[in-house]
From Swiss-Prot:
Protein name according to UniProt: UPF0102 protein Bpro_0391
Organism expressing this protein natively: Polaromonas sp. (strain JS666 / ATCC BAA-500)
Domain of life of the organism encoding this protein: Bacteria
InterPro entries, alphabetized: Restrct_endonuc-II-like (IPR011335), tRNA_endonuc-like_dom_sf (IPR011856), UPF0102_YraN-like (IPR003509)
Any one GO molecular-function label of the UniProt entry: nucleic acid binding
Gene3D superfamilies: 3.40.1350.10
Region (Disordered): 1-30
SUPFAM superfamilies per the UniProt record, alphabetical: Restriction endonuclease-like
Amino acid sequence: MWFSRKQVVKPPPDGSRAQPGQVTTKSRGDAAESAAQVFLARAGLIPVESNYRTPGRGGGEIDLVMRTPDGTLVFVEVRQRSGASHGGAAASISPAKQQRIIFAARHYLMRFASPPPCRFDVVLVHGGPGQGPVENGRLEWLPAAFDAS
């Protein structure tokens, strides 16, 4: 009887587990956020920050912070779903998710002596695997999709 040694494959130094050329959920999400930022910039919004995170555990994240020409800060949540089997991208923004975004926005606004007006927009990216959000033009922008009240 012979025994083979178990091979241990170490993850790449960047911490990802993806193989070269493999499309991951994170890479699809990053592409969706980039496409949304370009889309909103073409619509006249000015990029301020991306992937803003509150410090510590249990906080929130804001995908994009944009500014309108009149100075309103726009906190943007980008959601991508390949299908509508569970309600699509819009259905994935639960009240709990909205509260985490609002928490992060309040934290972000603490840097201002006098906070500017703000709103919460959503950009939905529709499309399945292999369907890039930019090429097929399936972005849906929902200005003032929810509020902090």
